[in-house]
């Protein structure tokens, strides 16, 4: 169990060694950061069943299912229940026209990565009252309630709040309404 700086250094050393030797290596880890940074291809398993095999960027950008979408990324993807009707969803009190046509309409779980939520101008805007703001220097994690957005149940079967990862070096007051937004092209729909 290495400290954070040493883990980063060791990942780089192992990655460089792997490239220098040029052999096929199977590396088993429960650490998604290790898997994403060190692998050419990653196998995501749940309960002994393969969920997806892909390059790290493919896993992140095109997750095969809810499990993969929730597993890859830190913080994890936000999930909301929504109904697609006439090519549009209602999220955060806003009608969101979906840019990609779906073969069928109905109920979906919508995925939205925390880093795809932005402060300020975006095609779809809404206001939140943060329940917590964590400052990490160059970025902040803004936790907020669903505001009636119908958050999909988490793995434990309990509804959870939402999180935005925003690039912001100034201070954010946790008790003031914040304008958040997103681009509908960055939404994921899961049956």
Where in the sequence are the language-model features?
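Generic alpha-helical hydrophobic packing signal
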Residues: 15, 41, 50, 56, ...
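Residues that scaffold the ATP/ADP-binding catalytic core of kinase and kinase-like folds
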Residues: 9, 62, 70-71, 120, ...
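Residues located in well-ordered beta-strands
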Residues: 55, 67, 81-83, 127-131
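Non-catalytic connector elements of ABC transporters
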Residues: 75-77, 86-191
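ABC ATPase nucleotide-binding domains
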Residues: 1-67
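Internal, well-ordered alpha-helical scaffold/interface segments
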Residues: 57, 66-70, 106, 115
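C-terminal boundary and immediately downstream tail of ABC-type ATPase nucleotide-binding domains
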Residues: 62-85, 111
């Amino acid at each position: 169990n290495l400290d954070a700086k040493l883990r980063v250094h060791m990942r780089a050393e192992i990655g460089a060694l792997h490239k220098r030797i040029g052999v096929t290596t199977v590396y088993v880890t429960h650490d998604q950061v290790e898997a994403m940074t060190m692998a050419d291809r990653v196998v995501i398993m749940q309960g002994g069943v393969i969920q997806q095999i892909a390059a790290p960027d493919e896993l992140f950008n095109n997750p095969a299912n809810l499990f993969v979408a929730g597993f890859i990324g830190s913080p994890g993807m936000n999930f909301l229940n929504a109904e697609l009707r006439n090519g549009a969803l209602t999220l955060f009190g806003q009608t969101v026209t979906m840019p990609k046509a779906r073969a069928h309409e109905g109920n979906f779980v919508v995925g939205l990565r925390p880093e795809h939520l932005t402060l300020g101008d975006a095609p779809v805007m809404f206001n939140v009252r943060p329940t917590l703001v964590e400052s990490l220097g160059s970025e902040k994690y803004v936790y907020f309630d669903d505001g009636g957005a119908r958050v999909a149940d988490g793995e434990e079967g309990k509804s959870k709040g939402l999180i935005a990862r925003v690039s912001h070096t100034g201070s954010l007051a946790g008790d003031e309404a914040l304008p958040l937004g997103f681009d509908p092209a960055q939404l994921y729909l899961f049956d």
